[in-house]
């Protein structure tokens, strides 16, 4: 959830400027507590020329234990992984093709075999099911050298599990 809509819109605008340079941008929320339920992003080198700061991603970190989360908070270079991306579709698809082409092949096949149903585009189930069962974070973001992290202060909090 986002509490401050105006700041979020401004962050999206800033992120779009970074994405226009070929980066896959991920919002990182500055932690205010050592939370063990969120993944973290370690801030890398500064990307020059962006108002408000943009950074490379030094590391993606799984949900830590309490001691590790406290260390991340104390160090100051770690941000909660919001799971919110801003990217150019062409750049993203190029990275998917490069890093895990099975995903793109399955998606293209499912789209090619899709059907119009009451004004909805229904993807062909079998082709879609053949796509690897892997998150964008694991398949692309943790492998790409095009990732960028934009710090946000928008009152973000995770909505939790959908399961």
Can you name each region flagged by the protein language model?
Residues 38-163:
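Catalytic core of tubulin tyrosine ligase-like
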Residues 1-47, 87, 94-99:
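Conserved beta-loop-beta/alpha segment of the NTase-like Rossmann-fold superfamily
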């Amino acid at each position: 959830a986002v509490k401050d809509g105006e700041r979020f819109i401004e962050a999206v605008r800033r992120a779009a400027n970074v994405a226009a340079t070929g980066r896959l941008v991920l919002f990182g929320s500055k932690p205010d507590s050592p939370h063990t339920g969120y993944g973290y992003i370690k801030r890398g080198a500064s990307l020059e020329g962006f108002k408000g700061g943009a950074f490379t991603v030094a590391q993606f970190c799984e949900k830590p234990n309490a001691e590790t989360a406290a260390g991340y908070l104390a160090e100051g270079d770690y941000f909660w992984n919001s799971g919110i991306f801003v990217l150019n579709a062409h750049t993203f698809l190029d990275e998917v093709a490069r890093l895990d082409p099975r995903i793109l092949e399955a998606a293209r096949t499912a789209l090619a075999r899709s059907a119009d149903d009451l004004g909805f585009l229904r993807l062909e189930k079998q082709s879609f099911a053949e796509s690897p069962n892997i998150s964008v974070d694991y398949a692309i973001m943790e492998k790409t050298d095009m990732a960028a992290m934009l710090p946000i202060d928008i009152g973000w909090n995770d909505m939790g599990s959908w399961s």
